[in-house]
């Protein structure tokens, strides 16, 4: 097979792959990133970041995260959005205007669930 023919075949394959769409996106109504998946009591839970258009800098269309949602499923096809479980205004030590809540996680220990996450702290008083 000639190099030109190989290149043509690879080009067609690359075009086909790039045009493929997800057939069952888990989250299709909001921008999300950095998910953690955990199984609790036979049900899978997703804890993603929730990316919004910044109310402070609207031209910045990424990395503006003010809250967390949690999603769950028992069959990996049908997902429930349990809504906002925590917002930056509820974090006493967090900067309510930082929009930097990302990469959360949740664990269970002795029947209690612990949700943890990074957030920008309030500015120190000088």
Residue ranges and their predicted role:
Residues 20-126:
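Carbohydrate-active catalytic/glycan-binding domains of CAZyme proteins
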Residues 1-23:
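Bacterial Sec-dependent N-terminal signal peptides
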């Amino acid at each position: 097979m000639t190099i030109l023919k190989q290149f043509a075949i690879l080009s067609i394959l690359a075009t086909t792959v790039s045009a493929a769409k997800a057939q069952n996106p888990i989250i299709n109504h909001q921008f999300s990133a950095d998910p953690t998946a955990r199984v609790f009591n036979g049900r899978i839970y997703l804890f993603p970041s929730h990316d919004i258009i910044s109310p402070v800098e609207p031209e910045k269309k990424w990395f503006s995260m003010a809250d967390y949602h949690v999603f769950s499923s028992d069959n990996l096809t049908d997902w429930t959005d349990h809504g906002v479980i925590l917002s930056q205004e509820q974090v006493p030590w967090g900067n309510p205007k930082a929009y930097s809540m990302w990469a959360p996680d949740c664990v269970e220990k002795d029947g209690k669930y612990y949700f943890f996450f990074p957030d920008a702290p309030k500015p120190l008083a000088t």
